[in-house]
């Protein structure tokens, strides 16, 4: 064994051995229990960041732990390879997205391998490869024929200069991020998944996932947004015909307080009203600009304009004005909302702004309603009763809703209804670098799905986008085709699928990536569901919801038998670091990497010029704040095991990890000490196996701590997923071992047992060091998770606290099985008690078994 801890040599040798032996290749046929561990696959941006390192180390610890416990473990890796960043890089660098993507994949694969992850690389997949996306095209055609996928007009962000659709995040202050042009809202045809058909099952299925964080389940439940309310109509007359303006409300009890109705800018009533009203037409046009994101709508200034139209209140017959509101989304509900300013905070602010009537129709005993300012109780449906509502006065929420719904139903103007916030999933993207939608447009036959034998529709990989429109439209060899139904000349669909489609089923394809005759084979049911899924909380809603939805689609196609894709979910926190900047006269900030900054006596200065920089606080590592740490530089300096140990020790996995150079140094020091301890032990020669007999108390105490540590580390990793406390327990054990300096046979035997166990306990976290020292301690022996010796946990003696008159005065050690008289005698004989009793006879002795003795003097 070499004396020095040389991580680069140790890690290179270990990785070469794993590759040669195909150590981490998962067996499809095995009599061992399966454990499928999956971390969310990365976008191949070109470089790993510390967030990746943390994510994949968490997964690797769990995978390696279960392998040591005898499980048949699968931990695959792939690449979420389609998407907008590749197009942007292509525009900037003049290279095809495919070339950029494949080069990045090669580089990032090398980086992942350098970290020593126990990945089965034989299952590697990239979503941009035709042998992957052909099967989502196949599923698309199946679902299109069944009506689960359909086509309709949808509103998007349109850049009139670049002639392209923009994602919500590409709209900055109402302008296109690249062209700077004012963005328009435009209606275009798009394909949609009927995810709403599965809304109830997606909601109820959350109750079958005890291994998911409650926070994530709550976020999904809120996103699905099941609500029971009333769908009701406000009648009106238009051009001599009787029409109805429909709205949905969960607060039908406030219907008597409606003072106006607001419609979306895209609503037919708004368009009709704007025909002869230039001012309204301009406002409608303004509403149609900017983002269509719901989050943006929620935070923007609420604006409106009266259309001049009136509708009739369904119960009172009074006229109610119709306004256009920029906060009303056409894609939600009916594109119209009833406004009750007295009992809805948004409506209250809107009514105050435009001087609209506010009518109180809910009262709470002991509270006084005021028009001056909003009060929380105005919207309280639990304590409120109807007031100023005629026959509904004094009714509580449920009774009022029932009565009003019944009266509306009798008039044919309403009914109780369950509604979901969830909307169908629009997957059309006017992008080049994505999975082609397998539809052919024929003038005679309409939209025709591409037959299975003609799949995949292969995306040309030699395209260099220029940022203006979809380049596929300019490729005659791609667009021009023959209708599979009638044989006439036709055009191929040039939209591509939302990249969330690829990431919604990749976990299943890992089970059978080599299967060429279908989307999945029987191996999918062998491996699914995923036993442990790991990823960031930012994916709590969209990705995880879409993957759950896709799993049900595949189940209903007979491809999988299970209902849910991921049995257990761990959402790790961010990696954060200090930020530093300087600000110029114009307010522009220049950010400096923490490695280039020195802090002394509370003052941060730039190493390059010695001048001060502003400390910007701790934030998520990012390019924009220049506060990232390059994992490769960390590996080069300290080794992969140090990087892994620090990221697992610095914080519990679900919390943010604050970067600390001192913490990295500390992790490296621990590994050096561990190596030195093993080296010195091995150099001392072979260890003679203990013949038996009693051990002296210090060795018994160490063995007790060793087996307590084995017990704790197993529980911390498997059940609690608290890797930091597992590492801390091993460190405490090593500190205890360091205090043993004897070289007798018993001491050396216990030291050997302890170091062997430590090698295995740490192997999931620092696999290169763990395997290397285990090989020195037990040459040729396979690594297995150590068993807890129950006998070692039994204590011969226990320590009890000594109190005199309720105050702590010392401790005593007694035999573990000592009875009450023996404990009392030991307590009274102790020097501490004798001192405080000062010759007095105690009035009472109270023994709390296993904890303390209290002597009342």
Curated annotation (Swiss-Prot):
Q: Which reaction does it catalyse?
A: tRNA(Leu) + L-leucine + ATP = L-leucyl-tRNA(Leu) + AMP + diphosphate
Query: Which Gene3D superfamilies would you find in this protein's record?
Result: 2.20.28.290, 3.10.20.590, HUPs (3.40.50.620), Isoleucyl-tRNA Synthetase, Domain 1 (1.10.730.10), Valyl/Leucyl/Isoleucyl-tRNA synthetase, editing domain (3.90.740.10)
Q: Which GO terms describe its cellular component?
A: cytosol
Listed A to Z, the keywords are: Aminoacyl-tRNA synthetase, ATP-binding, Cytoplasm, Ligase, Nucleotide-binding, Protein biosynthesis
Keyword Aminoacyl-tRNA synthetase appears in the UniProt entry: yes
Where does it mainly reside? cytoplasm
Q: What is this enzyme's class at the first EC digit?
A: ligase
Q: Does the keyword Phosphoprotein apply?
A: no
Per the Swiss-Prot or TrEMBL annotation, the motif 'KMSKS' region is positioned at 620-624
Signal peptide residues are none
Report residues binding ATP.
623
Where is the motif named 'HIGH' region mapped on this chain? 42-52
Q: Where in the cell is it found?
A: Cytoplasm
Source domain of life: Bacteria
Q: What is its EC number?
A: 6.1.1.4
| Any single Pfam family the record assigns to this protein | Anticodon_1
Q: Which GO terms describe its biological process?
A: leucyl-tRNA aminoacylation
Question: Which Gene Ontology terms cover its molecular function?
Answer: aminoacyl-tRNA deacylase activity; ATP binding; leucine-tRNA ligase activity
- What family does the entry list? Belongs to the class-I aminoacyl-tRNA synthetase family.
Per its UniProt record, what NCBIfam families does this chain match? leuS_bact
Task: Specify the protein name.
Answer: Leucine--tRNA ligase
Q: What organism does this protein naturally occur in? A: Thiobacillus denitrificans (strain ATCC 25259 / T1)
């Amino acid at each position: 064994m070499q004396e020095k801890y040389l991580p680069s040599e140790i890690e290179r040798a270990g990785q070469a051995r794993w590759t040669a032996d195909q150590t981490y290749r998962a067996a499809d046929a095995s009599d061992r229990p399966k454990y499928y561990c999956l971390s969310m696959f990365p976008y191949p941006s070109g470089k790993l960041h510390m967030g990746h390192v943390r994510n994949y180390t968490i997964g690797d610890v769990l995978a390696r732990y279960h392998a040591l416990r005898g499980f048949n473990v699968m931990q695959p890796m792939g690449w979420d390879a389609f998407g907008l960043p590749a197009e942007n890089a292509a525009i900037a660098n003049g290279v095809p997205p495919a070339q950029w993507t494949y080069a990045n994949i090669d580089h990032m694969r090398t980086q992942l391998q350098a970290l020593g992850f126990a990945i089965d690389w034989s299952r590697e997949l990239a979503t941009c490869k035709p042998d992957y996306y052909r099967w989502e095209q196949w599923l698309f055609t199946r679902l299109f024929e069944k009506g689960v996928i359909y086509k309709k007009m949808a509103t998007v962000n349109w850049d009139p200069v670049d002639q392209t659709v923009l994602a919500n995040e590409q709209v900055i202050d109402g302008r296109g991020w690249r062209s700077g042009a004012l963005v328009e809202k435009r209606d275009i045809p798009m394909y949609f998944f009927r995810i709403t058909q599965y809304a109830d099952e997606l909601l109820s299925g959350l109750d079958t996932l005890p291994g998911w964080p409650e926070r994530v389940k709550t976020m999904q439940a809120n996103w699905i947004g099941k609500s029971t309310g009333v769908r009701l109509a406000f009648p009106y007359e238009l051009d001599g015909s009787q029409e109805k303006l429909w709205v949905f409300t969960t607060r039908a009890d406030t219907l008597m307080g409606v003072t106006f109705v607001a419609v979306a800018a895209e609503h037919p009533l708004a368009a009709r009203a704007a025909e002869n009203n230039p001012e309204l037409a301009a406002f409608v046009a303004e509403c149609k600009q900017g983002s269509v994101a719901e989050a943006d709508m929620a935070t923007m200034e609420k604006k409106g304009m009266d259309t001049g139209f009136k509708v009739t209140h369904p119960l009172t017959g009074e006229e109610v004005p119709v306004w256009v509101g920029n906060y009303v989304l056409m894609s939600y509900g009916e594109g119209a909302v009833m406004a009750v300013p007295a009992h809805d905070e948004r409506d209250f602010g809107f009514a105050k702004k435009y001087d609209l009537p506010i009518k109180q129709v809910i009262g709470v005993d002991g509270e006084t309603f005021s028009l001056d300012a909003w009060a929380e109780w105005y919207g309280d449906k639990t304590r409120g009763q109807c007031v100023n509502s005629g026959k509904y006065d004094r009714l509580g929420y449920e009774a009022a809703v029932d009565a009003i719904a019944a009266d509306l139903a009798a008039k044919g103007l309403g009914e109780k209804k369950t509604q979901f916030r969830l909307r169908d999933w629009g997957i059309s993207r006017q992008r080049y670098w994505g999975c082609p939608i397998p539809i052919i447009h024929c003038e005679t036959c309409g939209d025709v799905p591409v037959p299975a034998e003609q799949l995949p529709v292969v995306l040309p990989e030699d395209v260099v986008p220029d940022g203006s429109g979809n380049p596929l439209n300019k490729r005659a060899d791609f667009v021009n085709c023959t209708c599979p139904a009638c044989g006439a000349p036709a055009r191929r669909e040039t939209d591509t699928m939302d990249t969330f489609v690829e990431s919604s089923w990749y976990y299943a394809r890992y089970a059978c990536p080599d299967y060429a005759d279908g989307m999945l084979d029987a191996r999918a049911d062998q491996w699914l569901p995923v036993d442990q899924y790991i990823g960031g909380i930012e994916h709590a809603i969209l990705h995880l919801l879409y993957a759950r939805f896709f799993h049900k689609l595949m189940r209903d196609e007979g491809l999988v038998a299970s209902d849910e894709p991921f049995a257990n979910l761990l959402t790790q926190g961010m990696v954060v670091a200090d930020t530093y900047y300087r600000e110029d006269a114009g307010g522009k900030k220049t950010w400096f990497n923490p490695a280039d900054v020195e802090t002394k006596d509370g003052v941060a200065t730039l190493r390059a010029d010695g001048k001060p920089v502003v400390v910007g606080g701790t934030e998520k590592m990012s390019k924009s704040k220049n506060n990232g740490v390059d994992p490769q530089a960390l590996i080069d300096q300290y080794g992969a095991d140090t990087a892994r140990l620090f990221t697992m020790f610095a914080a519990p996995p679900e919390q943010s990890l604050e970067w600390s150079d001192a913490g990295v140094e500390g992790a490296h020091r621990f590994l050096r000490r561990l190596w030195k301890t093993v080296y010195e032990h091995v150099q001392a020669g072979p260890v003679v196996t203990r013949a038996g007999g009693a051990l002296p108390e210090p060795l018994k105490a160490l063995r007790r701590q060793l087996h307590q540590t084995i017990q704790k580390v197993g529980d911390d990793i498997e059940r609690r997923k608290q890797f930091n406390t597992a590492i801390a327990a091993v460190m405490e054990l090593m500190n205890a071992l360091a205090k043993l300096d004897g070289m007798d046979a018993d001491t050396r035997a216990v030291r050997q047992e302890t170091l062997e166990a430590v090698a295995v306990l740490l192997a999931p976290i620092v696999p290169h060091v763990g395997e290397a020292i285990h090989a020195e301690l037990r040459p040729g022996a396979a690594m297995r998770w150590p068993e807890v010796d129950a006998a070692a946990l039994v204590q011969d003696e226990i320590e009890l606290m000594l109190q005199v008159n309720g105050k702590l005065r010392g401790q005593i050690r007694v035999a573990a099985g000592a009875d009450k008289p023996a404990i009392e005698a030991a307590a009274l004989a102790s020097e501490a008690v004798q001192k405080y009793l000062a010759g007095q006879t105690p009035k009472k002795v109270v023994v709390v078994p296993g904890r303390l003795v209290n002597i009342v003097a």
